[in-house]
Curated annotation (Swiss-Prot):
Matching SUPFAM superfamilies: CinA-like, Molybdenum cofactor biosynthesis proteins
Gene3D superfamilies attached to this UniProt entry: 3.30.70.2860, CinA-like, MoaB/Mog-like domain
Top-rank taxon: Bacteria
Record's protein name: CinA-like protein
């Protein structure tokens, strides 16, 4: 089966918004063992849409079309598909009734413009959208099925998961025997990881892929077929052994997610004091429901005065060692933990750049501490200074990993291949 994707919208074509739908769809299909072979982005011009539908339908077996199903004048996907096939738009009575019911349930009067969303190509098969007003549909043109989906990410994900994936499995008799293991890493570049893994002799049906999403690189281990699935745990275990401390989570999208679930299930509490990370550690945890059960407070103590007055850092420590130092960050962590007697506290202080560095402490120098009931662990690391965002996100990741290792009763401070360290 040859799968392609057509993304629509002037704002997508012009780069005014990042096409996260395309990235999500490609990643999701990969996890189902299907690779997208081509992706095309086209603006909201009727003639361009007609042309791309006609041209790509000669080459693909299935095309997922995303966007252009709304009620406004620049939503042209249904009209373009009808013209590409040489047929009329007709009202889908079932979807019109669904639209009217939706507005009634929400105590709203339905604008006449929304009736456009019930107009489908004459030969179209309606595809349900249980979470929105845009009607999905599929049409056969030339050799391809074109499957039309809304641009709203939440609606797209429902439709792909509940409608598209079952459709292609049935239509093309796809082998559903596909399994995936994800390993999340930090502290090593993609090329360094590949150098370690490419020499491995993998069993038949096992393949490895990489996805860079700084500060993490995700390793995806695919198993296709019953025999490959049976040996997947053994292969994943061997890869973890080869990569060592670089692997920080399994089947989690971020290290913050790993920490969230470990704390959620442990009954332990956490406080955070952040300087250079500016609330990033706290914010990433708050993204997950239930974080209030363990996260007691998150403080952004950016100025020296706030470090002294809020966290109780000794002014002489700042005078003698500076804000970016082991001594200061240890006092920050201790102070943050003591405020509410948390089980743990993380603290960061560093130079994120692009300015502020010195010969002794260049941009990318970050001090991180973890305070526990039994003592304090700390280190001062040297991070790549490619960007301010990278320094901050890597700092948060290393802080999370220190806490993760403490929760597992492992060595809290370890070496990472691409991260230097000034002091333990």
């Amino acid at each position: 089966m040859k799968l392609e994707m057509i993304c629509t919208g002037e704002e997508v074509l012009a780069g005014q918004i990042v096409d996260t739908n395309a990235a999500w769809f490609a990643s999701t299909m990969m996890e189902h063992g299907v690779e997208i072979q081509r992706r095309v982005t086209v603006g909201d011009r009727l003639e361009d849409l007609i042309a791309v539908f006609q041209e790509r339908s000669l080459h693909a077996d299935v095309i997922l079309v995303n966007g252009g199903l709304g009620p406004t004048s620049d939503d042209m996907s249904a009209l373009a598909m009808a013209k590409a096939k040489g047929e009329a738009l007709v009202e889908n009575a079932e979807w019109r009734e669904r639209l009217e019911d939706w507005f009634t349930r929400n105590n709203r009067e339905m604008p006449l413009s929304n009736l456009k969303q019930a107009m489908l190509p004459e030969s179209a098969v309606m595809v349900d959208n249980p979470v929105g007003t845009a009607c999905g549909f599929r049409v056969k043109l030339n050799r391809a099925w074109l499957f039309f989906t809304p641009g709203v990410p939440f609606e797209l994900k429902h439709m792909v998961t509940e409608q598209f994936v079952p459709f292609i499995r049935d239509e093309f008799n796809l082998d559903s025997k596909v399994a995936l293991k994800k390993l999340l890493t930090i502290g090593q570049g993609e090329s360094a990881l590949a150098d370690k893994l490419e020499p491995l002799e993998l069993p038949e049906g096992i393949t490895i892929g990489y996805r860079s999403s700084m500060p993490h690189i995700e390793i995806k281990i695919f198993a296709r077929g019953e025999k490959a699935i049976a040996v997947l745990p053994r292969v994943a275990g061997h890869i973890k052994m080869v990569l060592g401390t670089a692997v920080v989570a399994e089947d989690k999208a971020t290290l913050a997610e790993e920490i969230h679930y470990k704390l959620l299930n442990s009954g332990l509490t956490l406080s955070v004091a952040e300087s250079c990370t500016g609330g990033m550690i706290t914010s990433q945890l708050v993204d997950f429901p239930g974080s209030s059960s363990y996260l007691q407070h998150g403080l952004v103590t950016y100025s020296n005065e706030s470090k002294v007055r809020v966290l109780g850092v000794n002014p002489s420590t700042l005078d003698d060692h500076g804000a970016v130092s082991i001594a200061t960050v240890e006092e920050m962590a201790k102070g943050a933990r003591q405020i509410l007697d948390s089980d743990y506290a993380l603290a960061t202080s560093g130079i994120a750049g692009p300015d502020g560095g010195t010969d002794e402490k260049p941009v990318g120098t970050v001090a991180i501490a973890l305070a526990t009931r039994g003592g304090v662990y700390s280190q001062m690391i040297k991070l790549p200074r490619r960007s301010r965002d990278l320094v901050r996100s890597l700092s948060a990741a290393v802080a999370y990993d220190m806490l993760r290792r403490e929760l597992l009763a492992e060595a809290v401070i370890v070496d990472y291949q691409s991260i230097g360290r000034f002091s333990k």
